[in-house]
Amino acid sequence: MTEIMVSTDRLVKAEIFRQQLYSIAKDMGTIMIRTSGEPIISEAVDFSTFIADKNGEIITFSGYMTMHTGPAQAAIRYILQNYSEEEILPGDAFICNDPHTTAACHPPDVGIVKPIFYQNQLIAWSWAEGHVLDVGGMAPGGFTVGAHDAYSEALRFPGIKIVRKGKLVKDIVHLIKVNWRLPERNINEIRSFIAACNASENQIVDLINKYGVDEFHEYVELNKLLSEEAFRKRISQLPRKTYEGTEWAEHNGHVNDLFQIHCKLTVGEGHLTFDFNGTVAQTDGFINVSKGTAIGCALTPVMLALTQDIPFNEGILRAIEFILPEGTVVSAEMPAPTSMGHAETGMRISKLLTELISQAMMESDEEKTRSYAMACFHDAWPAGIFYGSDSEGKMFILADSNGGGAGGGAQTNQDGMDAAGCFTQLSNGLPDIEINELTFPVLYLWRQLNVNSGGPGKYRGGQGIDFAWIPWGVPGGHETVNTACWQVPPRGIMGGYPGGTSGYWVIKNSNVHQFMEEGKVPMYSELAGKKELLPAKHIGFPIHPDDVFVQFEGGGGGLGDPLKRDPEIVLQDWQDGYITKKMAKEAYGVVIDENGRIVEQGTQVLRINIKSNRLHKGLKPKKECLVNSNELTHIKSSGESLVIKEDIKGLRYVCCSGCEYPLADENSDWKEGAKVLKTEAPKALGKFGMWVKNREEAPFVFVDEYICPGCGSMLHIGTSIGEN
């Protein structure tokens, strides 16, 4: 790409325009928070806002939900393709929630798309989308565990007018009222989205009145060009190479299978290609995603790893190609159901690309670029929908947004964030417990960090959360659950371990009310009753007044060999209640005595023994690299666990960063030069006190540990599936 030559004055003005447009998009979000009346918007921040140019190219977005980038672009373009210029009029607004036409992440994500006119000329579009509590279909709350097709899931709107010339279309409003279970609340949410779009139009018109329509178009396009140029330069810091990996979506709502998602990342000259050939065909369960949703989820690690300091707009997309085979779980066609797709397959896409991009960044010659590599977020949204009727016969639906409390992936300089939420939804918040209790018929017993859930590493994965509630003021109800990351844990990086996984318990016929009558709130260990583990996906599980519903969320992946973690930090983690003594000892090799002090000599001996045990149990390397490390010269690091060294002929080799043991030449798979220890995931992580759901039949999930044959350091930990 030819470098853009722009005067300083124009650059300054372009930035002023960019900031003003970004501020308008953020103001749209503020309006939604203040007017929707729903905790899922005001507390959980489950929405996004965008502004696009007249052709549907993204100008700016508010940053709330990064995975909405694909659906926003697709929705506007679908409307442009299906309506003539004469049919799109000032004052109009379109409603869209159909994954198969307007690429909604799932039907409960309802978008309002508004054309913006200046002097009767179409100049831009605004888009406001948020999660609506119910959209009809077979399951209250919109997560249709038992659906076999899209027809069962929801009343879907493919970008049709809900506002015509400034007035609500009564027929559409009436259609919503008779099909959605909470019509008054649903309509109020949609009105708040419309209000946000109306406000954006007023502010953009004011901006054009100030600067003129020609300057508006000029600086909108210039900002796209500047972002494109900056991004292509960033890509040029990565090796020209292809990286390949696989992830697995779990349990499609009907069968507990594993569904392969495969991606090949090719780094070209200022260009990235993500090729998803090798991904399985779409399924009749609700874990499929639309092409637009797949793109939105794929863009998340791109934005947060490679463009964290580059304004996001259409310019970024010009440097990326997505190859998404139609009829697969990553580009589903009618009639595939999709209501859990974004939170299962979509987040697997995000995790897989986080790993592939981090691999490329670790091999960069630029130290700053290498420093942005990271482990995977837990990236699951363990959804819980509690529904029923209150004492007056009115229906309630609690879409518990505490699902956004899973742990973040470790970074190259710090632990992962606790209760970070999902990588694709970083602006999500955890709802205020009191607000939930005021709005819905539940009483929370606790909400706390989930001990031992973060993946062990030199830098620990962030912890997830653990919470419990009981029905309150109602004669019970039913619970629909659906979580990803139940059996396949989120991978660590550079020798860090995967994080723990997520799930649900119900304690049936508990003694909770005995404590309540005494004015006490019981903790988990005090509760008696029958403890029942729920499936990852289940619809309509009965919850009675004496039952306690418990949800626990896993952590992010760790980074670096946990034996490299400072024992004092391990001790602090134990004192803070983040980990148990078992985790400290088995994962980190730190011995803590009965007085809460580190046993220094015992710790040193234990760490030596752990490395020796790795070497003893690990399988012999597939290939041996027959070079003398002493004859090699250090060139650069390649992440926490590896270094690149060079011989006198200029040939480069991948070596262990600890002992500099040569593993392979730079163009070969260095893992073939490492010892390998393959263990079923529940056993591999369970020895640390972590939780991973075991699979009762093949394929089984394994943790694959790659160990330096020279010193026993942990170089890399992957996951795989197999028969035995």
Regions found by a protein language model. Give the residues of each.
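Extended intrinsically disordered, low-complexity coil regions enriched in Ser, Thr, Gly, Ala
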Residues: 649-685, 719-724
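Fe(II)/2-oxoglutarate
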Residues: 615-642, 654-656, 660-663
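Acidic, low-complexity intrinsically disordered segments
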Residues: 715-716
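Short Cys/His-rich Zn2+-coordinating modules
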Residues: 631-651, 684-695
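Short, cysteine/histidine-rich loop/knuckle motifs that typically chelate Zn2+
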Residues: 657-658, 708-710
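Glycine/proline-enriched, intrinsically flexible loops and inter-domain linkers
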Residues: 2-90, 95-118, 122-620
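Flanking scaffold residues of small Cys/His-coordinated metal-binding clusters
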Residues: 650-651, 700-703
